[in-house]
Amino acid sequence: MEEKYSSQALAGGGVLGPVDVPSARLTRYIVLLCFAKFLKAVGLFESYDLLKAVHLVQFIFIVKLGSAFFMVLFQKPFSSGKVVTKHQWIKIFKHAVVGCIISLLWFFGLTLCGPLRTLLLFEHSDVVVLSLLSVLFTSSGGGPAKTRGAAFFIIAVICLLLFDNDDLMAKIAEHPEGHHDSALTHVLYTVIAFLGVADHKGGVLLLVLALCCKVGFHMASRKLSVDVGGAKRLQALSHLVSVLLLCPWVIVLSLTTESKVESWSSLIMPFITVIFFVVILDFYVESICSVKMESSKCARYGSFLIFISALLFGNFWTHPITDQLRAMNKPAHHESTEHVLSGGVVVSAVFFILSANILSSPSRKGQKGTLIGYSPEGTPLYNFMGDAIQQSSQSLPRFIKESLKQILEEYDSRQIFYFLCLNLAFTFVELFYGVWTNSLGLISDGFHMLFDCSALVMGLFAALMTRWKATRIFSYGYGRVEILSGFINGLFLMVIAFFVFMESVARLVDPPDIDTNMLTPVSVGGLIVNLVGICAFSHAHSHGASRGGCHSHEHSHSYHGHSHSHGHGHSHNDHGHSHGHSHVSSGGGMNTNMRGVFLHVLADTLGSVGVIVSTTFIQQFGWLIADPLCSLFIATLIFLSVIPLLKDACQVLLLRIPPEQEKDLHAALEKIQKIDGVISYRDPHFWCHSASVVAGTIHVQVVSDVMEQRIVQQVTAILKDAGVNNLTVQVEKEAYFQHMSGLSTGFQDVLAMTQHLESMKYYKDGTYIM
């Protein structure tokens, strides 16, 4: 939905915030924008191919010449509009000079980084960059959300600088020191070499600088575009002046340097493609969409599509499937390996997409309302319920600080956190030493430990979420997250055990050779770390093994805990509906989350023991079959140990009556049946919500002259003794069924109520109730 801000005042005197209006008419502009950005990505990849054969200045001159020709032809800047004054011509000249400099930086960065990285770094809208600079250099940067967006942007740039392997050796061989195509490229390469960074990293910094210059250039051009009669007229005149500025330089280059182009006629279509896709189409579509849509929407959709297109072409541009999109012919039997996709650039693209989405989002200063109609007086009525349930954003440092405080407050989460820190420390030591000694075994085991840390993180997050307060949407709170966490951890372990079992069976047939040089010290170190975890989480195993369901403990001493119950009811036509809640201090019980974490640690411990045993047999006796045999034994143990966890978690998720409380609940229902004034009960439902909450609902039929609150108190007390600490009791009388029969209920419902009514007129001993 498109958001528009209205200046009308509400009846109460408040100012109306953004109001949702239909956005179906914007679909065509969104599609047009996405199509233009897709073609711009094609044009920039084509530009990179052209720059391999054409000098940088010649390339910019031809692009400016073609753009000036089309824009002067379309806009007619000399025959339409007011006459441009001499002072304005001077400003247009300065505008053209700065535009040429930015183009030089842009396309030189393209030659250094390739089209994929150039699109990721340079194709950010002014809205995104201004929001980024506002967060970095002003005190009112837009709140925590904008701060996260700025952090994502910086992380994306760092990923390109540090974790992106961009074929540096090929680039060094391509332009050895002392040989460059022209004085301009020599100067730029000298500056990059002076900074002490590789060409690819220098290109990243150059494109970031060009991006900032582009945004400042656009901001400074706004007043000039108004003075000369619009942005389109300014662009036409500026491109024309740029051609005149670059013409002498191009002539000198043509006379002093040897051209790499074999046939200029073969480059006509590639240049037309670049001019139309990169300059003309993108400029006009941006102009139209910025008028029809909000700038934030334009930036968000445009950035997302061009980044996705960049990743797509970065992987398939040299593939035969893209030959139809390429205007410039690819040399036969040639597959380029420069500027290919890497893990760093993919991660960077993800962070760029996230940052563009966050930084381009408008700061909401009013409530978001939907027009639902008009009052009899003609005043517009708006619904603001959508924002009423939204939570306010919170700064990341404060969220981390409060989360850490909550983690350290409770025993379970504190144990997980301490063991996670120990596990991470061992993991990074293992990875560092593996990289230092070039040991593939240490590196692979380090990443295996890192995967185990992810299970600990999930368990820690689940332990933290269980203490979150209930909200309007999640009215029961987040206690069941620990059940889900344990269930997912159990599934992970079962999948791991299955694959280990299958691999072990395959290795039994053909045992491979094993390098045991580093296995023993690594396994001993892992065993020590995991034994610490076994000691830390053993209480979870003991609770889970002793009682498979969920339960709560009550203490009679006041200083151990507290227990209270309350009920409230109302009677309308002799029908009472009451809720009784008893809150009991939880002293233990099955914690599925902790059991899942414990089983993960146990599996790692068994793995370390198995590696030590198999390594000993291999080193002493040369029994290669010991490794798959130990793996088979360990996989079987893991599988069998996970089954009870999954069984208990499934029972909780399926709302089964807690097994250990079945007898108590059955006895409690018999006691309820014997309460004075109670005729019968129906629809008793009891289930385990979490490790410390057993919930239940029950309908109790009573005689007409009984006091509802007394029944509620007695039923609540009986079921609380049976372990139900979150109870809803509905009291029903004979007049209630008569009242419901008179309503517009279905025939089957009325028939069932009537039959139940007849059964209520007699006690079990046959006595008739008057």
From Swiss-Prot:
Cleavable signal peptide: none
Gene Ontology terms, MF aspect: metal ion binding; zinc ion transmembrane transporter activity; zinc:proton antiporter activity
Protein's organism: Gallus gallus (Chicken)
Cellular component, GO annotation: cytoplasmic vesicle; endoplasmic reticulum membrane; ER to Golgi transport vesicle membrane; Golgi apparatus; Golgi cis cisterna membrane; Golgi membrane; secretory granule membrane; trans-Golgi network membrane
Record's function text: Together with SLC30A6 forms a functional proton-coupled zinc ion antiporter mediating zinc entry into the lumen of organelles along the secretory pathway. By contributing to zinc ion homeostasis within the early secretory pathway, regulates the activation and folding of enzymes like alkaline phosphatases and enzymes involved in phosphatidylinositol glycan anchor biosynthesis.
Pfam families named in the record: Cation_efflux
Catalytic activity: Zn(2+)(in) + 2 H(+)(out) = Zn(2+)(out) + 2 H(+)(in)
Positions of the UniProt region annotated as Disordered: 548-586
Membership in a protein family: Belongs to the cation diffusion facilitator (CDF) transporter (TC 2.A.4) family. SLC30A subfamily.
Parts of the chain on the Lumenal side: 51-53, 117, 171-190, 257-264, 322-339, 437-445, 502-517, 619-622
SUPFAM superfamilies to which the protein is assigned, alphabetical: Cation efflux protein transmembrane domain-like
Gene Ontology process terms (BP): GPI anchor biosynthetic process; intracellular zinc ion homeostasis; zinc ion import into Golgi lumen; zinc ion import into organelle
Keywords: Antiport, Cytoplasmic vesicle, Golgi apparatus, Ion transport, Membrane, Metal-binding, Transmembrane, Transmembrane helix, Transport, Zinc, Zinc transport
Superkingdom of this protein's organism: Eukaryota
Name assigned to this protein: Proton-coupled zinc antiporter SLC30A5
Predominant localisation class: Golgi
Segments in the Cytoplasmic topological domain: 1-29, 75-95, 139-149, 212-235, 286-300, 361-415, 467-480, 539-597, 644-770
Cellular localization per UniProt: Golgi apparatus, Golgi stack membrane; Cytoplasmic vesicle, COPII-coated vesicle membrane; Cytoplasmic vesicle, Secretory vesicle membrane; Golgi apparatus, trans-Golgi network membrane
Chain positions recorded as Zn(2+) binding sites: H448, D452, H600, D604
Record membrane topology: Multi-pass membrane protein
Keyword Transmembrane: yes
Subunit structure, interactors included: Heterodimer with SLC30A6/ZNT6; form a functional zinc ion transmembrane transporter.
Region called His-rich loop, residue ranges: 539-579
Annotated InterPro entries: Cation_efflux (IPR002524), Cation_efflux_TMD_sf (IPR027469), Msc2-like (IPR045316)
Transmembrane segments: 30-50, 54-74, 96-116, 118-138, 150-170, 191-211, 236-256, 265-285, 301-321, 340-360, 416-436, 446-466, 481-501, 518-538, 598-618, 623-643
